[in-house]
Curated annotation (Swiss-Prot):
Gene: rpl13
Name of the featured protein: Large ribosomal subunit protein uL13c
Subcellular locations according to the entry: Plastid, Chloroplast
InterPro entries according to UniProt: Ribosomal_uL13 (IPR005822), Ribosomal_uL13_bac-type (IPR005823), Ribosomal_uL13_sf (IPR036899)
Oligomer and partners: Part of the 50S ribosomal subunit.
Lineage top rank: taxon: Eukaryota
GO biological process: negative regulation of translation; translation
UniProtKB keywords: Chloroplast, Plastid, Ribonucleoprotein, Ribosomal protein
GO molecular function: mRNA binding; structural constituent of ribosome
NCBIfam families: rplM_bact (TIGR01066)
Organism: Guillardia theta
GO cellular component: chloroplast; cytosolic large ribosomal subunit
Keyword Chloroplast listed: yes
């Protein structure tokens, strides 16, 4: 008879990973990041448990996109006021808030609901190469 192993949330303390986004493709990086956050590569993967993996992405300002998406891809946000729609291109948003692009891409891939919001809090994105998480000794994640 097969036995299903059910992992409790308290057991795993999670791992810290670091990813260098220099010259990485936006979609591929976001996809691998989301899979690691969800815990798909964990031997005890369960879709309803937060594996508590924390990912630090550095050099988010050096991410690349293929084709003409730098000028043709749009990001929308609305203030809630009448006529409050703001449209920015990839290039404009990258110059203003470079980490926001990766955050939006990963958030769109993560599951929708309470667990997805909890997983998104485990993503830390920084534009430069420095970050305040050196004390956690993050493991380099090669893609």
């Amino acid at each position: 008879m097969n036995k299903t192993i059910i992992r409790e949330g308290k057991i795993n303390l999670g791992k810290w990973f670091i990813i260098d986004a220099t010259d990485k493709n936006l979609g591929r990086l976001a996809s691998e990041t989301a899979k690691t956050l969800v815990g798909k590569y964990d031997p005890l993967y369960a879709p309803n448990v937060n594996p508590k993996n924390i990912i630090v992405i550095i050099n988010a300002d050096k991410i690349r996109v293929t084709g003409n998406k730098k000028f043709d891809k749009f990001y929308y946000r609305h203030s809630g006021q009448v006529g409050g729609l703001t449209i920015e291109t990839f290039n404009e948003l990258q110059s203003r808030l470079p980490g926001r692009i990766l955050e939006k891409a990963v958030k769109g891939i993560l599951p929708k609901g309470p667990l997805g919001r909890e997983l998104f809090n485990n993503l830390k994105v920084y534009a430069g190469s420095s970050h305040p998480h050196e004390a956690q000794n993050p493991v380099a994640l090669v893609m």
